[in-house]
Design a protein with these regions (language model features):
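Acidic, Mg2+-coordinating catalytic module of metal-dependent nucleases/exonucleases
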Residues: 129-135, 140-141, 178-220
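Active-site-proximal helix-loop-helix substrate-binding element of RNase H-like nuclease domains
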Residues: 79-82, 90, 94, 162-201
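Serine residues within intrinsically disordered or low-complexity segments
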Residues: 2, 6-12
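Conserved non-catalytic scaffold segment of RNase H-like nuclease domains
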Residues: 35-39, 44-133
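Catalytic phosphate/metal-binding cores of nucleic-acid and nucleotide-processing enzymes, i.e., regions
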Residues: 35, 52-55, 139-154, 167-172
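Aromatic (phenylalanine/tyrosine) cluster motif
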Residues: 10-11, 16, 28
């Protein structure tokens, strides 16, 4: 498991709310909303659903809206007791030897991995928003594991799907909002390797570029 915090100062990310004086000598604190942190997440699994099958690897890359990479998290997980790999998924893994070897090293129990992940999410200097491509698959595993092993989800029940966001920006039907139909300017020169952390970083940068274009913001 690894959790990396960048050298970006916490206090440069979160606005300071000083006490404001009132007549009579009392003061009150100004409440300022925490910024959103976009937690681009990728999982690798040995089947289509959690429970009968297991999440093998979990990685997240936490981005500010301006594409500043604040922190990363990665963990490889032991398989669930009584679970087994789905035949079709395991056949696919046979074509991905390097990625399979990478996600079977330094294994943590699901309980330890998810406790560590929850603590990492709570240390982020903002409100975490789950982001993935496709969100339905990755969020299904992460939410199930968070509730099963920690009893809570900092993401609540919500996730942001990059493909759906692209559908809106491109004004295309959902099935046409594929990466092949996305403009090249949205893509940074980052690898997509089926190593969970690489993929989380790559798709997080993609989302931030889309966000910047949508709201007219400059990325780092």
């Amino acid at each position: 498991m690894s959790a990396k915090i960048s050298l970006v100062s916490f206090f440069s990310l979160v606005p300071f709310a000083p006490a404001c004086p009132l007549q009579g000598g009392r003061a009150f604190a100004v409440k300022i909303a925490m910024p959103e942190i976009y937690v681009s997440t990728d999982v690798e699994a040995d089947g289509p659903i959690p429970g009968p099958h297991s999440m093998l690897s979990l990685a997240s890359a936490a981005y500010l809206p301006n594409k500043t990479l604040v922190s990363t998290f990665a963990a490889n997980l032991e398989t669930l007791p009584g679970a087994s790999g789905h035949p079709e998924t395991m056949a696919w893994w046979q074509t991905q030897a390097e990625a399979w070897d990478a996600c079977r090293k330094e294994l943590l129990s699901p309980h330890v991995a998810m406790k560590n992940y929850l603590a990492w999410l709570k240390r982020l200097p903002g409100r975490p928003v789950f982001v993935a491509y496709p969100a339905a698959y990755d969020f299904m595993f992460v939410y199930w594991y968070l509730i099963r092993f920690t009893g809570e989800s900092p993401f609540s029940h919500s996730a942001l799907d990059i493909k759906t966001y692209a559908m809106a920006l491109l004004r295309k039907e959902y099935r046409e909002a594929t990466k092949d139909n996305m403009p090249k300017r949205w893509f940074d020169q980052l690898p997509h390797t089926h190593l969970a952390l690489d993929d989380a970083i790559e798709q997080g940068a993609l989302f931030c570029n889309m966000l910047a274009e949508n709201v007219g913001m400059k990325c780092e």
